[in-house]
Amino acid sequence: MNEAKLKDGERVNQLFSTDVKIIQNSEVFSYSVDSVLLSRFPKLPQRGLIVDLCAGNGAVGLFASTRTKAKILAVEIQERLADMAERSIELNDLTQQMQVIQDDLKNLGRYITGSKVDMILCNPPYFKVDKKSNLNESQHYLLARHEISTNLEEICKIAQRILKSNGRLAMVHRPERFLDILDTMQAHNLAPKRIQFVYPKLGK
């Protein structure tokens, strides 16, 4: 474990039930239980390449690193979050396994050509932008939660393009988008093989 390089407002947290530590900032971004659920849901490939789309501060990839030896490529559009992810990777001495790309998903073809990805992990923005949208959040949370810089259509299109023929996409999303997810996946020749609904508490 290396020494943490912290900036104003940042703290180091230990990831749930692991020895991995992560740099967080409540005003910018902090991981939620969705990241834990996503990283534990799929059977991860033990070799090859895993790509974490909409990576935020790197929580999903860091969680996944405890369960696989595969290379993990975390892609995040926001410079501040990508920087936090990079420093968390250094903090945990994972630079040989994990790498961060700070760029728009629209430019992913610059970094990954062809169908060579074994698994995609994705905790995407959940909410469509419409007249009812609450757009008064901080810019960091706004981009993380709302389909402004990317959307479900683009994520499925990317998955169709970069996954190997036997590759898999694991995604966490809101139940009210379920039918939309199925339709969008089908439009891009993706078929759900396993679905798990998660309830916040018994009886909900």
Which residues does each predicted region cover?
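Conserved SAM/SAH cofactor-binding pocket of Class I
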Residues: F41-C122, K128-S133
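Conserved Class I SAM-dependent methyltransferase catalytic core
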Residues: S149-P200
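Mobile active-site "lid"/loop adjacent to the S-adenosyl-L-methionine
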Residues: P124-E154
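SAM/dcSAM-binding transferase cores
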Residues: G203-K204
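Short, structurally constrained coil/turn elements
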Residues: F16, L44, L94, Q186-N189
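Class I SAM-dependent transferase core
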Residues: E3-P45
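General small-molecule cofactor/ligand-binding pocket signal
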Residues: I23, Q99-I101, K193-Q196
